[in-house]
UniProtKB/Swiss-Prot annotation:
Coiled-coil regions listed in the entry: none
Protein name, as recorded: C-type lectin
Pfam families the UniProt entry points to: Lectin_C (PF00059)
Annotated InterPro entries: C-type_lectin-like, C-type_lectin-like/link_sf, C-type_lectin/snaclec_domain, C-type_lectin_CS, CTDL_fold
Domain C-type lectin per the UniProt entry, residue ranges: 33-155
Length: 158
């Protein structure tokens, strides 16, 4: 009986591998980071257009949220290595109520910030969305008008 079980499990493994089941891995064009998959899109969109694009792309998709230095480092390396000259890049942080109360679009906790020196400065009371600041090597954040056009990083949970 145990031979039947072993053979059955073997066939199941073959079937799953042939059917493309990958378990907990990201698609080839995405990078894996702390249980999420990320991909940079070079198309320039407003913050809201980028967020809507990410939501439509994958179930549970949103602009990227960052929760520790290692998250910032991984994404900075990815952008710098693969998309030279991309400019600033939208992430999922914004001040929806315009009260300097920053929230992630995926509703995860806002427990980490990596603002560039002097930021957020809310120039002309109109900077309510956040991008990775290119001159910092994508490690620091800057607040920006949400209508600005930038490339963006989507993410979804594995």
């Amino acid at each position: 009986m145990w031979q039947f079980t072993v053979v059955s499990l073997g066939w199941l493994a073959v079937f799953l591998s042939l059917s493309g089941a990958k378990g907990n891995s990201c698609p080839a064009s995405w990078i894996s980071r702390n249980g999420v998959c990320n991909k940079l899109f070079p198309d320039r969109k407003t913050w809201l257009e980028a967020e809507m694009y990410c939501r439509a792309l994958k179930p549970g998709g949103h602009l990227a949220s960052l929760h520790k230095d290692s998250d910032s480092t991984v994404l900075a390396w990815y952008i710098s290595d693969h998309f030279k000259g991309a400019g600033h890049v939208w992430i999922g942080l914004r001040d929806t109520n315009k009260k300097r109360s920053w929230k992630w679009s995926d509703r995860t906790s806002t427990n980490y910030f990596s603002w560039n020196q002097g930021e957020p400065n809310n120039v002309q009371d109109n900077e309510n969305c956040v991008h990775l600041w290119a001159p910092s090597g994508y490690l620091k954040w800057n607040d920006e008008p949400c209508a600005s056009l930038h490339p963006f990083i989507c993410q979804y949970k594995l």
